[in-house]
């Protein structure tokens, strides 16, 4: 869900690295082509790449590389969550950004206790969902 004038769509978390379980890239974009080259380079040349970073997991690395391209036209699918009142100590947009974005109309993200339950908890919803799946 990005338009041709966008380079990247992702599920952000304000003040923290994004949720990288889902993102979209405009592969015709020169900025994205350069982003992907750098993203691969930091893994292929780990001694001069990810091993120089504070954290090595995909979401952190993704954010570090994304920040190297400030001209990238980005769409943060979870930006609307940043204005919601978070629980004490929470990062804005954290929790379950996928189901609270437009993607929640089609996708659920099951891991941990949600995987055992077979669906996300109603308490995970921060926005009203009208789809039958969520009723």
Feature map (PLM): residue ranges:
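GT-A fold catalytic core of metal-dependent nucleotide-sugar glycosyltransferases
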Residues: 1-14, 24
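A glycosyltransferase accessory/donor-loop signature
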Residues: 27-135
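Short, solvent-exposed loop/turn segments at the edges of secondary structure
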Residues: 17-18
